[in-house]
Amino acid sequence: GGDYYDFPETSETHPGDFTVAIGDVSGHGIPAALMMATARAFLRQRSILPGTLVEIVSDVNQQMVRDFGETGGFMTLFYLTIDTKNKCLHWIRAGHDPAIFYDPQTDTFEELRGDGIALGVDMDAHFAQYQRTNLKRGQIILLGSDGP
């Protein structure tokens, strides 16, 4: 019930970008599903507004702390934007497993790492945006979760 993936709409604020969010909410069953649905709504609402990835994730984190702080619930998140115009990736990692970047030309794998704690834990958490430039056709990004 707590696994999450989505493609938040950002076309008005970042034309040409493609955004992917994947996460996992703590717990199981109906409580986890409700927390995931709420987190999804927060993220979708914030993603359509102007702002950097850091601002988006920070705002969602603060809202989750307000809503779930006393329950001990939290959500991991990997938030990735593909900038098709400039051929680069931007991402924030908030406690989620790193994504894997595969380049078939060099037959190499790279973990897209980054610092950041899960959402809903600390009102003052700091998140950092990371990037990878020079994207080429055929490269693959793998995102995963522990759910089915």
Protein language model regions, located:
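Conserved subregion of the PPM/PP2C metallophosphatase catalytic domain
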Residues: 2-26, 30-32, 36-148
